[in-house]
Swiss-Prot record:
The keyword Signal does not apply. The gene is proB. PANTHER family: GLUTAMATE 5-KINASE. Pathway: Amino-acid biosynthesis; L-proline biosynthesis; L-glutamate 5-semialdehyde from L-glutamate: step 1/2. One of its GO terms (molecular function) is ATP binding. InterPro entries: AceGlu_kinase-like_sf, Asp/Glu/Uridylate_kinase, G5K_ProB, Glu/AcGlu_kinase, Glu_5kinase, Glu_5kinase/COase_Synthase, Glutamate_5-kinase_CS. It comes from Sulfurovum sp. (strain NBC37-1). It catalyses: L-glutamate + ATP = L-glutamyl 5-phosphate + ADP. Substrate binds at S46, D131, N143. CDD domains: AAK_G5K_ProB. SUPFAM superfamilies: Carbamate kinase-like. This is Glutamate 5-kinase. ATP binds at K7, S163, D164, T205, G206, G207, I208, V209, T210, K211. PROSITE patterns: GLUTAMATE_5_KINASE. Catalyzes the transfer of a phosphate group to glutamate to form L-glutamate 5-phosphate.
Length: 257
């Protein structure tokens, strides 16, 4: 059985200032389908701040407010997931990590036992950073770094990032009509990793750079990452279920012909 981590970003899960319920439903349906095809799936989900904002519209530019919104929104987000997974007779669980959990072998070991047990019992772990006490991903990263660490330390074969960025291109496709998709990337240049990040929207804190940093981390540890659109899931379905690489970008240190 192949183990994967799927990370969905804020831009995919939010629409008009609240949770995009149809996109969330499509994501849950994808995970249910993957499980039928013998995948173990853990989900790293953003969206807590957006969910909290629907109940208390605080200024999101203030870090303390974002922490408060995340605290309000996290249980709301989980409830939405629980209702949708129940339609497929699936249980989901909430797993919150503090930023320093991956700095301790003991903490990683304990967390892995919990994740392994959940997956062995057909439960979908829904993972997020505990934004009330850990603010780095809340400020910058949109869980890209967290998802890479989850994939590595919990022995996933692949990290799938579903984003408003549907692939890596040789130049900015928003500015250049002749931009070409890079289907497979074996190495990321240092200047690509050091470029200034570009926030996606009012709820998102990442951009292509944090995704490249996640991919670079995984490739250096012998693991792979697939970047694809979270708005239209045909590319990720083709890649994971049909074994066809029609869209998106695969980051792998293994050269493929």
């Amino acid at each position: 059985m192949k183990r994967i981590v799927i990370k969905v970003g804020s831009h995919v899960l939010t629409e008009d200032g609240s949770i995009a319920r149809e996109r969330m439903m499509a994501l849950v349906e994808l995970i249910a389908d993957l499980k039928k095809h013998s995948y173990e799936v853990a989900l790293v989900s953003s969206g807590a701040v957006a969910a909290g904002y629907t109940q208390l519209p605080l200024d999101r530019d203030d870090i303390a407010n974002r922490q408060a919104l995340a605290a309000i929104g996290q249980p709301l987000l989980l409830k939405m997931y629980q209702e949708k997974f129940a339609r497929f007779d699936l249980l989901c669980s909430q797993v919150l990590f503090s930023a320093d959990v991956f700095e301790s072998d003991k903490h990683v070991s304990h967390a892995k036992v919990a994740i392994d047990t959940l997956l062995a019992n057909n439960v979908v772990p829904i993972i997020n950073e505990n934004d009330t006490v850990s603010i780095e991903e809340l400020v910058f990263g949109d869980n890209d770094r967290l998802s890479a660490h989850v994939a590595h330390y919990f022995d996933a074969d692949l990290l799938v990032i579903l984003s408003d960025i549907d692939a890596l291109y040789d130049k900015d496709p928003n500015c250049f009509q002749d931009a070409r998709r890079r289907a497979v990337v074996n190495e990321i240049e240092e200047e690509e990793l050091a470029a200034e990040h570009t926030p996606n929207n009012e709820f998102a804190t990442g951009g292509i750079v944090t995704k490249l940093q996640a991919a670079d981390f995984l490739m250096k540890h012998g693991r792979e990452m697939f970047l694809a659109s979270g708005f239209e899931l045909s590319d990720v379905k083709s890649f994971l279920i049909e074994g066809e690489h029609k869209g998106g970008t695969l980051f792998t240190s293994t050269k493929r012909s």
